[in-house]
């Protein structure tokens, strides 16, 4: 059975194409997306850190307000990452460990009749963002994941993670999986993002711990 799956009818700039995976391994941290303004998550430092928690994002549009329940236009996730400030020979800030479980509940994003489910198999890098407007802390991290619906694996992913104080509805989160063209990102400060490219949480909470 072919592992090619194309999802059409996807709103805004979000596209998904689930394709066969490559045998090559790329452990390099991914660059922020091009083609738009990015005023946060450009300056980083390797330092001990820990980010924990989970949440819900009602994207699109990614504001603090929840979409109508019947629409199923939202995403949920659980995620954590821990780093001790170690750097490899290429200057990459190494992660000690981490996890990500991501579910996109939008009907148009279903794969094989089920919500799109992304599962991290390896978290390789984590760096503290020193320029993001996240009052308690911000982290850019990522690694490799698997599409649970298809078994497609060894896909690079990165997330932008923002703890913007309490309550959690001021926090933000964004994800990108370039090899399948999947992104959930927000770009309008004061409307749908506390710090580009993160989208406001409509549920849950992110907790930044500067050391562990």
Q: Where on the chain are the PLM-derived regions?
A:
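Bacterial N-terminal signal peptides that target proteins for export
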Residues: 1-10
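Bacterial Sec-dependent N-terminal signal peptides
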Residues: 17-44
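Tryptophan-anchored aromatic micro-motifs
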Residues: 44-65, 141-145
């Amino acid at each position: 059975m072919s592992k090619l799956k194309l999802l059409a009818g996807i709103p805004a700039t979000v596209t998904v194409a689930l394709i066969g995976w490559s045998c090559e391994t790329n452990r390099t941290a991914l660059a922020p997306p091009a083609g738009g303004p990015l005023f946060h998550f450009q300056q980083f430092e390797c330092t001990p850190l820990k980010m924990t928690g989970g949440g819900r994002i009602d994207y699109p549009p990614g504001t603090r307000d929840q979409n109508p329940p019947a629409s199923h236009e939202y995403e949920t996730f659980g995620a954590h990452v821990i780093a001790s400030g170690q750097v490899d020979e290429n200057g990459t800030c190494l992660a000690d460990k981490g996890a990500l479980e991501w579910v996109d509940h939008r009907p148009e994003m279903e794969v094989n009749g089920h919500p799109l489910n992304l599962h991290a198999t390896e978290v390789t890098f984590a760096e503290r963002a020193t320029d993001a407007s996240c009052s308690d802390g911000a982290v850019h991290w990522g690694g490799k994941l698997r599409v649970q619906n298809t078994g497609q694996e060894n896909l690079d992913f990165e997330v932008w993670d923002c703890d913007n104080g309490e309550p959690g509805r001021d926090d933000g989160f964004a994800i990108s999986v370039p090899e399948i063209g999947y992104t959930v990102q927000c770009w309008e400060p004061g409307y749908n993002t506390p710090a580009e490219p993160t989208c406001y949480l409509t549920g849950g909470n992110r907790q930044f711990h500067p050391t562990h």
